[in-house]
Amino acid sequence: MCGIVGAVAQRDVAEILVEGLRRLEYRGYDSAGVAVIHNGELNRTRRVGKVQELSAALETDPLAGGTGIAHTRWATHGEPSERNAHPHLSEGDIAVVHNGIIENHHKLREMLKEHGYHFSSDTDTEVICHLVHHQLKTNDSLLAAVQATVKQLEGAYGTVVIDRRDSERMVVARSGSPLVIGFGLGENFVASDQLALLPVTRSFAFLEEGDVAEVTRRTVSIFDVHGNKVEREVKESEITHDAGDKGEYRHYMLKEIYEQPLALTRTIEGRIANKQVLDTAFGDNAAEFLKDIKHVQIIACGTSYHAGMAARYWLEDWAGVSCNVEIASEFRYRKSHLFPNSLLVTISQSGETADTLAAMRLAKEMGYKATLTICNAPGSSLVRESDMAYMMKAGAEIGVASTKAFTVQLAGLLMLTAVIGRHNGMSEQMQAEITQSLQSMPAKVEQALGLDDAIAELAEDFADKHHALFLGRGDQYPIAMEGALKLKEISYIHAEAYASGELKHGPLALIDADMPVIVVAPNNELLEKLKSNVEEVRARGGLMYVFADVDAEFESDDTMKVIPVPHCDIFMAPLIYTIPLQLLSYHVALIKGTDVDQPRNLAKSVTVE
C-alpha cells in the first residue's frame, strides 16, 4: 500500500526520491511528500493527489540535500489531506515515513501529550515521530532511540527515520510491512519495493521481521528483534531496469495482458522434462515434502483466491487429493480442522499480502506438514518463510488489476496438480497431456489475444450499464468470478459471478434487458447443462454475451452475442477464457474514462490488515 523511499548520498536526492515514488504509484495512494536535510535543516514538501503534483511543487521550489525520505500515503487514520501526508516531523528535528497501522496509537498519543508534544495530524504515524524524539532525550543515538521506540509499538510498521542533527544517517525498522535496503557506491537507499530503486542500484537486502537497520553512505548495519547484529544476504535483482515503463502501450494493464505469452514461457521453462513436471519446480526439497500429501489447503486474497478456486477442481479431479480454498482474512479467524499429511499453499503476487502472511504463520503453528508459496517476488516474506516456493517469473506487474500474474498462477497450480498427482498414482498419459498443455499455452494465449479488436467493439454495449452478471460451471466458475472482479475493479460497474447452476436460486430475479449476462462456455462435459442455463436467461429477456469454444455450436441472434474462443484442451481452458474477460474489462474502462492502472480506492500490494 503506502510507498516508501529513502536515500543517503553525497548528491542531491530529491529527484531520486520522487522518481522512486513514481515507480511505486501502483501501490495506491492519495497524497505524497518528501523531506530532505540540507545544512542542518529539515525541509519538507507535501501535496494531496498524484506524485506529479509533488514533482511540480519541487520544480517550483527545489529541495537540496543528500539525505531524505519520501512517501505516498494510503489513508487509514485521518482523511487525505496535506497535514496528514507524510513525512511527519517532531520539533523540526525528526522526520518519519511509515507504512502500516499502529494499533496502540491512542494510548501513546495521550502519553506523549503529557510530555508536552503537540500533534498536527490525525495519523498514527505522528506517534512514531514524537516517540523517537522523546527517546533521544535518554538514548545516545538515533539507532538506540528507534530500537527503544519500536518496543513500544503494537501493530504493523515499515518506517524510516532521519534526524537533522545527524544528517548522514537513516534508521529503518520493519514489522509486518516490507522494506528493502539498496546498496550503491558511496550511497545507500531504502524502499518498500526494489522496483523503486532500480534506476540507482541492483543490489538489495531484504529486512526480516523485527529488523532495525542503520544506513549511512558507506555502511549498513542490521540488528534483529533481540538487538543482535546480523547479516542479511545481498542479492542482485533479476527485474529489468525498464520494468516500470509502459513502452508502446497506453496502459500498464494492456502491456501486461499482452506480456502473458512471454510470462507463461518463462514460468514453464526448465520445469518440464520427459513429459513430467519436475518436483524441483517447487524447490530443491520439494519431492520429500510433496510425496505423501493427501490434503491441500489454499489461502489467498482477491485474484489469487480465484486462481486457488480453479486449482481445487484440478487437485480433486486429477491429483486425487482433497482441497479447501479459503480467503486469508477468514482462515485466520475460525478454528479449522487440520487433516493428516496436509500441504498449505499460499498464493500472492507480492509475497507481502498481510492477511496471507498472517494466515501462513498461523498454519505453521497448527502443524501443517509443509508450506508452499506461489509468488512473483524473490526475497519476499512469503518466499523466505515457506518451506517451498514456486517463483512465477511473470516479471513486474504494475497495473493494480492483476492480469499476467493470474494466468501464471494458474499455470503454476496446474504444475502442482501434476506433481502431487504423480505421487498419488496419476497415469503417465495424463501427466504427458498436462505437460503438453502447459507447453502449448503461450501460443494458445497469443491466439486468444487476437480477439482484442472484436472485444473492443463489444465493449461499447457496456458503457451505459450499471450491473453485470457472469456465469460459469466447474473450473470456469472461478474464471467468471475473476471476470466480474476485473470489470468492477477498473470500470466501476457492479458485477457479480455465479455458478450457472445457481441461477434458479436468486440471480434470475435480476435478469432484464439492462443486465448483461456474460457466459464462459468451453466445450467440456458441462456444456449441455450450461446451454440449459443460457435458455433460462433468454426466456426472461436477458441479453447475453457468450464466450464459447469454436466447436460449441452457439449461434448469435437478437438476444445473444457469441464470441468464438480458440479451441483448447480441458487443462488450459480456464486460462484461455480468462484472456477475453481481461480485454473486456480493459476496453469498457477505456470507454468509461476511468483510471485503468490506478482505479480509485484500490492498492496493488495490500500490506496492512
Swiss-Prot record:
<dbReference type="GO" id="GO:0097367">
    <property type="term" value="F:carbohydrate derivative binding"/>
</dbReference>
<feature type="domain" description="SIS 1">
    <location>
        <begin position="286"/>
        <end position="426"/>
    </location>
</feature>
<keyword id="KW-0963">Cytoplasm</keyword>
<dbReference type="InterPro" id="IPR035466">
    <property type="entry name" value="GlmS/AgaS_SIS"/>
</dbReference>
<feature type="active site" description="For Fru-6P isomerization activity">
    <location>
        <position position="604"/>
    </location>
</feature>
<keyword id="KW-0808">Transferase</keyword>
<dbReference type="GO" id="GO:0005975">
    <property type="term" value="P:carbohydrate metabolic process"/>
</dbReference>
<dbReference type="InterPro" id="IPR017932">
    <property type="entry name" value="GATase_2_dom"/>
</dbReference>
<feature type="domain" description="SIS 2">
    <location>
        <begin position="458"/>
        <end position="599"/>
    </location>
</feature>
<dbReference type="Pfam" id="PF01380">
    <property type="entry name" value="SIS"/>
</dbReference>
<feature type="domain" description="Glutamine amidotransferase type-2">
    <location>
        <begin position="2"/>
        <end position="218"/>
    </location>
</feature>
<dbReference type="GO" id="GO:0006047">
    <property type="term" value="P:UDP-N-acetylglucosamine metabolic process"/>
</dbReference>
<dbReference type="InterPro" id="IPR046348">
    <property type="entry name" value="SIS_dom_sf"/>
</dbReference>
<dbReference type="Pfam" id="PF13522">
    <property type="entry name" value="GATase_6"/>
</dbReference>
<comment type="function">
    <text>Catalyzes the first step in hexosamine metabolism, converting fructose-6P into glucosamine-6P using glutamine as a nitrogen source.</text>
</comment>
<keyword id="KW-0032">Aminotransferase</keyword>
<dbReference type="InterPro" id="IPR001347">
    <property type="entry name" value="SIS_dom"/>
</dbReference>
<dbReference type="GO" id="GO:0004360">
    <property type="term" value="F:glutamine-fructose-6-phosphate transaminase (isomerizing) activity"/>
</dbReference>
<dbReference type="InterPro" id="IPR029055">
    <property type="entry name" value="Ntn_hydrolases_N"/>
</dbReference>
<dbReference type="InterPro" id="IPR005855">
    <property type="entry name" value="GFAT"/>
</dbReference>
<dbReference type="GO" id="GO:0006487">
    <property type="term" value="P:protein N-linked glycosylation"/>
</dbReference>
<feature type="active site" description="Nucleophile; for GATase activity">
    <location>
        <position position="2"/>
    </location>
</feature>
<dbReference type="GO" id="GO:0005829">
    <property type="term" value="C:cytosol"/>
</dbReference>
<dbReference type="GO" id="GO:0006002">
    <property type="term" value="P:fructose 6-phosphate metabolic process"/>
</dbReference>
<comment type="subunit">
    <text>Homodimer.</text>
</comment>
<keyword id="KW-0677">Repeat</keyword>
<dbReference type="InterPro" id="IPR047084">
    <property type="entry name" value="GFAT_N"/>
</dbReference>
<keyword id="KW-0315">Glutamine amidotransferase</keyword>
<dbReference type="InterPro" id="IPR035490">
    <property type="entry name" value="GlmS/FrlB_SIS"/>
</dbReference>
<protein>
    <recommendedName>
        <fullName>Glutamine--fructose-6-phosphate aminotransferase [isomerizing]</fullName>
        <ecNumber>2.6.1.16</ecNumber>
    </recommendedName>
</protein>
